[in-house]
Amino acid sequence: MPATAVKKPSFHYGWVIVFAGMLCILACLGFGRFALGMLLPSMAATLHLSYSQMGFISTANFLGYLASVLVSAHWAGRIGSRRLIFLALLTVAVSMALVSRATGFLSVLLLYMITGIGSGATNVPVMGLVAAWFSSGRRGRAAGFIVIGSGFAIMIAGRLIPYLNRWIGPEGWRASWLILSGLVMLIAIAAVAMLRDGPGEKGLAPVGAGETAPPVDPGPGQAGMNIYRKGIIYYLGAIYFLFGYTYVIYATFVVTTLVRERGFSESLAGNFWMWVGFLSLFSGPVFGTLSDRIGRKAGLMIVFSLQAVSYLLIATKLPGMFLYLSIVFYGIVAWSIPSIMAAAIGDYVGPKKSAAAIGFVTFIFGLGQISGPAIAGVLAERTGSFSGSFYMAAAFAGAAIALSGFLRKPQTA
């Protein structure tokens, strides 16, 4: 595009895309997934759910998520990311509203699987927009700000859900699902108003496009490449699998562990979960930006190291101070891996193939999310404690550190 045809405004619309993307992640992952950890104890009491059933409910959500990420890039290409995101968020909102009326394990299982379908069909195109709207040197920061939406959602859920449970009683979780559903619906409307599929729609170049001379272009060879034949995509997928397997065990069961095994009240456990949300607000921007500076490999190794320590601290049942440290270490890196991974994929395959590559790697990530809570729930059922599950998560995080250490530098941006 000729230089005269590209606007360079003082405030780039790409940051509006980041804000809209953050709202989308808040809705589809924050409310659609991470609120579950706060809701499970009261749902389990009312619906008489076992540990293994709690794990399978989380797994069902990830099965839906997994199915949708396989086709999300295809549908984003056909109808556009903006429209797909809107329809997917509507799916999340409606399914969450229906969960509020569930009467047993099977109904929750099926409806929450549909929520997962909507979550995946939102997340993949949202993260794919990062490569379209931002140059390589800005992608980590942009993705980092987008993923903090989950942190805001955790803070809201950590305060709202215990309050409703105290006010309404044992059935308070139903009101929580309904209110969260309404918020997702409002975000869907806001997102469709703000999102655009690419900077060309606004007559703009990507953010930071003029900061390198010349900007790196994937070229015709990369533009026509088959991402499924690139070994690096599978390698990134393996690392992302380990993240999916481990982080979701903590996110799903830490509140249940605090309430059932440590004797915490639901309100106090909610305060702990709210602190995770607050600390996580810094995770994406800080570590995404850090990975722009020190490289994706070093960024991944630092994050997985802190996560491994977090899992070990809660597994060992040490005194309260160590529990606080576990919460801190988990929170400060909570959403770092998705932001680094989205940026890394853009680095390796370029903006044109980014959405498809993110979709495929997220599919592998989803396999980890499916396996983690199911195995952790069954293990806890057999041992009577989640300690073994958290030890397992720490071991898998250690494997992720090792894999990240052998990650090679990308050839394209």
Positions of PLM-derived features:
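Cytoplasmic helix-loop-helix junction between adjacent transmembrane helices
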Residues: 113-148
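Helix-breaking motifs and short loop linkers at transmembrane-helix boundaries and internal kinks
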Residues: 48, 80, 101-106, 263, ...
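Paired small-residue
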Residues: 95, 106-114, 321-329
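C-terminal transmembrane helical hairpin of 12-TM major facilitator-type secondary transporters
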Residues: 274-283, 289-344
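C-terminal ends and interior cores of transmembrane alpha-helices
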Residues: 90-103, 306-318
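Helix-loop-helix hairpin linking two adjacent transmembrane segments in secondary transporters
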Residues: 145-200
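Extracytoplasmic gate region of multi-pass secondary transporters
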Residues: 36-40, 229-282
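Core transmembrane helices of Major Facilitator Superfamily
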Residues: 29, 114-126, 330-341
